[in-house]
Amino acid sequence: QHERIVTLANGYALTKREREILQYLSLGYGSVYISKTLFISDNTARTHIRNIYRKLDVSSREELLSLVNGMK
């Protein structure tokens, strides 16, 4: 799954931080956990998540996970 995330990150021009957050999202973690783990505000985590969704052209966690798991 890590390789798929790296491929997506490179293909969709995700930043290093967005790639890091995508990894957590793919493991099922939400913005609160991510913000505490990465020592950023919840609002910042949510902004990164919105940017990831926009760049990957997905609108839900389900779509995101399908893309990460190679089903889209």
Predicted regions and their residues:
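A short, Lys/Arg-enriched amphipathic alpha-helix from helix-turn-helix/homeodomain DNA-binding modules
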Residues: 12, 19, 27
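Short helix-to-turn junction characteristic of helix-turn-helix DNA-binding domains
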Residues: 25-29, 68
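Conserved catalytic core of two-component sensor histidine kinases
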Residues: 15, 22, 46
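Recognition helix of helix-turn-helix DNA-binding domains
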Residues: 28-63
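Linker/hinge segments immediately adjacent to helix-turn-helix/homeobox DNA-binding domains
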Residues: 1-16, 32, 72
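Residues marking the start of alpha-helices
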Residues: 8-10, 25, 52
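Cytosolic histidine kinase catalytic core of two-component systems
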Residues: 16-17, 59
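Pre-recognition alpha-helix immediately N-terminal to the DNA-recognition helix
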Residues: 19-23, 63
